[in-house]
């Protein structure tokens, strides 16, 4: 069992029950999945760029990503229907907790000029999104072997009903919110 999973079961869940007064243990918010998405618009011109992005995301997530394809053609972006435009990976269970642990304790402190993450990026239904500007903050990515700096979007999906509950859950997981 992952370290954060044990902390959730032993400390965070009972703390949230006290804080919000839940009557059933199934009401306690928990993490459902973490989705990592990397949009690679440059892949339209060069196929090797997509291979490098897939390799980077595989190292970060520890799981092979799915290549996402364009649903319809957009002439302004020079995209045809079915063309590879990004990659994504969904983490659940132990892998999700392991990634969250590495992200909060190792990757976030490596961000340049880091002052905490925004507490306003909740979607109104208890899910949180964070954008990472460069993939080199993850220790799995070797700085010398990176062909280009690419950002990625990290979506954290919870069972929380409100943003307040989700923020309490993520704060208990030691998320460094600045406001």
Curated annotation (Swiss-Prot):
It comes from the Bacteria. Keywords: Ribonucleoprotein, Ribosomal protein, RNA-binding, rRNA-binding, tRNA-binding. Transmembrane segments: none annotated. Disulfide bonds: none annotated. GO terms for cellular component: ribonucleoprotein complex; ribosome. Part of the 50S ribosomal subunit; part of the 5S rRNA/L5/L18/L25 subcomplex. Contacts the 5S rRNA and the P site tRNA. Forms a bridge to the 30S subunit in the 70S ribosome. PANTHER family: 60S RIBOSOMAL PROTEIN L11-RELATED. This is one of the proteins that bind and probably mediate the attachment of the 5S RNA into the large ribosomal subunit, where it forms part of the central protuberance. In the 70S ribosome it contacts protein S13 of the 30S subunit (bridge B1b), connecting the 2 subunits; this bridge is implicated in subunit movement. Contacts the P site tRNA; the 5S rRNA and some of its associated proteins might help stabilize positioning of ribosome-bound tRNAs. This is Large ribosomal subunit protein uL5. It comes from Acidovorax ebreus (strain TPSY).
